[in-house]
Design a protein with these regions (language model features):
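Helix-to-catalytic-loop junction in kinase catalytic cores
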Residues: 1
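Helix-rich C-lobe and terminal helical cap/extension of kinase-like folds
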Residues: 18-168
Length: 168
C-alpha cells in the first residue's frame, strides 16, 4: 500500500523467504503500479459501509468504470448486485483482524461464484469488458494470493494491517 505497486503473479516460484522471514520477489515481470485514481476507489470498496451505501457504492463503481453514463437503470442494478456479491466474498479477509485462509468454505464460495458467473447469460450480454484496465491485475493478484494462502493452509493471518482503514 505504501508503494502502490504489487506483484500480479503470486505463486511460490516467484518468491523466496529469507532467514529473517522477509519476502523476496524473484520475478519482476509482473510488477504493476496502481494509479491513485484507481487505488483510492478500489480500496474504498473494501469498507463494508461503502458497499452498503447505495449512493456511495454507485459513485465508486462509476469512478472505476464499471457503470457507464449510458447504462440503463436495469443494467446498473444488475452490475451493482453482481459487484456487491463479488466484493462481499473477496473482501472477507479484510473484515476481521485475522483471517483463516485454510477455511475451505471461503475458497468454495469463490469457486461456486466463478462457476455460476461463467454460465450467467445476463452477464454475457453486457457490452464489453467492464471496469478499469487495472481490475484484471488486482483481481488476479488477490485470487492468486488467496489460492496460495489456502494451499499453505494459512491460519490466523493478520489482515487488518493491510486494510485501507489503517493506511495513511
Amino acid at each position: 500500500h505504501e508503494l502502490k505497486e504489487f506483484h500480479a503473479d503470486p505463486h511460490p516460484g516467484n518468491f523466496l523467504v529469507d532467514d529473517d522471514l522477509n519476502l523476496i520477489a524473484l520475478d519482476f515481470g509482473c510488477l504493476k503500479k496502481i494509479p491513485n485514481e484507481f487505488y483510492t476507489p478500489y480500496f474504498e470498496l473494501v469498507i463494508e459501509e461503502n458497499r452498503n451505501d447505495k449512493t456511495k457504492f454507485r459513485e465508486i463503481l462509476t469512478k472505476l468504470e464499471v457503470i457507464y453514463p449510458e447504462d440503463s437503470e436495469k443494467e446498473i442494478e444488475f452490475l451493482e448486485g453482481l459487484f456487491h456479491e463479488l466484493l462481499s466474498i473477496f473482501t472477507k479477509p479484510f473484515q476481521t483482524d485475522n483471517f483463516d485462509f485454510s477455511d475451505e468454505s471461503f475458497f468454495q464460495e469463490i469457486v461456486d461464484l466463478g462457476k455460476r458467473l461463467s454460465k450467467d447469460k445476463e452477464l454475457r450480454s453486457q457490452n464489453g469488458g467492464r471496469g478499469s484496465k487495472h481490475f484484471i491485475y488486482m483481481n488476479r493478484t488477490f485470487f492468486g494470493l488467496y489460492n496460495l494462502m489456502f494451499d499453505l493452509k494459512s491460519k490466523d493471518i493478520l489482515t487488518s494491517k493491510f486494510s485501507p482503514s489503517t493506511i495513511s
